[in-house]
Amino acid sequence: MLPIITKTKRRARAANLSQFFLMGLLFSTLVSRFPALKELYGLSIAELGFIPFAMSAGSLIATPICVFLSAKYGSRKVGMFCYLQTLSLCLFVLMPEKYMLFGVAVLYGALMELSDIAMNANSIIVEQAYKRPILGMFHSFFYFGMALGAVISIVTMQIGLSVTVHYVVMSVVAFIWFAINHVYYLKETPAKSAANQKFKILLP
């Protein structure tokens, strides 16, 4: 029987590998169906191109908040924003007006950034627990997830599955998937200096 500490580390590593895979799967699912979103809402090429721009803006806005929250509360707690990210995927196909998509894109970008930083921070804790470099393995699983997401999207397009059904089903699956992953995230105790730190934006 393996020692408890070894089981904990292995489960945390598996959970982080699974989480990187899931994040790649979600990202690939979203962008690979952009042509279907264009058709669903009657977007122009310029309007479609503004969606990834809005996502980037959301990520940029959220970055200093992510760093502050991770330092103050720890990556495991901040990682819970991924619940909202998984659910927000389906918002892309449920908006009554196309211009509301851009607000959804900003929100999704911000939530994706929060989830991503928390995931990376927790993977560093796992690497420290293993006392050997394993971050590269985590990041490789992101691209495996992207590859699977692309394959699934190709299949859904070939069988004529609507982007609405695709996104809603993926949102539900991803929500459950993350709930399982999050159970095995390693906990960390934030430093006292970080716990008492007030939010501020640091300029270069």
Feature names for model-found ranges:
Residues N16, F34, K38, L43-P52, ...:
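Juxtamembrane helix-start elements in MFS-like secondary transporters
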Residues V106-S140:
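Cytoplasmic helix-loop-helix junction between adjacent transmembrane helices
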Residues I5-P35, E39, V106-A110, K200-P204:
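Pair of pore-lining "gating" transmembrane helices in MFS-fold secondary transporters
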Residues K77-L91:
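Structural signature of the two symmetry-related core transmembrane helices
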Residues T164-V183:
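Symmetry-related core transmembrane helices of the 12-TM Major Facilitator Superfamily/SLC fold
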Residues V93-A105:
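Helix-loop junctions at membrane interfaces in 12-TM secondary transporters
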Residues I61-G74, M157:
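Helix-to-loop junctions at the C-terminal end of transmembrane segments
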Residues M55-A57, Y143-L148:
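Short hydrophobic/small-residue motifs within alpha-helical transmembrane segments
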